[in-house]
């Protein structure tokens, strides 16, 4: 019984660890997922966005006191509009997902939700970090040297 408890605790600790992607590894995943050029957004812009939003950390969260919402995951997807965290007032959940899935190592739902975000009229400008650090900048450095 004690062995099972130790094993369960070990598995739990493994499941809550963050995955921090290397920028080239992240770029390859995005490319395979059809993000390069999606809605006119280059691969380098997506990588720049994730660098400044989460530093490629799948477990990144950021609470926004003004809207009482939280940004989740590698793309910092907001609980007010895009996912359900069960605590954000007047949440829309336009991606129809739990915010928890944005914190795991599987990026498929993060990517699908990011695609949903850029389909809105605001597009990639929905991300404040993209506007501050990537818009109208040479973002080629974010994929330079990556074997894509």
UniProtKB/Swiss-Prot annotation:
Assembly mode: Monomer.
Origin organism lineage: Eukaryota, Metazoa, Chordata, Craniata, Vertebrata
Extra remark beyond the main annotation: Lysozyme C is capable of both hydrolysis and transglycosylation; it also shows a slight esterase activity. It acts rapidly on both peptide-substituted and unsubstituted peptidoglycan, and slowly on chitin oligosaccharides.
Protein name: Lysozyme C-3
Enzymatic class: hydrolase
Source organism of this protein record: Sus scrofa (Pig)
Record's catalysed reaction(s): Hydrolysis of (1->4)-beta-linkages between N-acetylmuramic acid and N-acetyl-D-glucosamine residues in a peptidoglycan and between N-acetyl-D-glucosamine residues in chitodextrins
Subcellular location: Secreted
PROSITE patterns: GLYCOSYL_HYDROL_F22_1, GLYCOSYL_HYDROL_F22_2
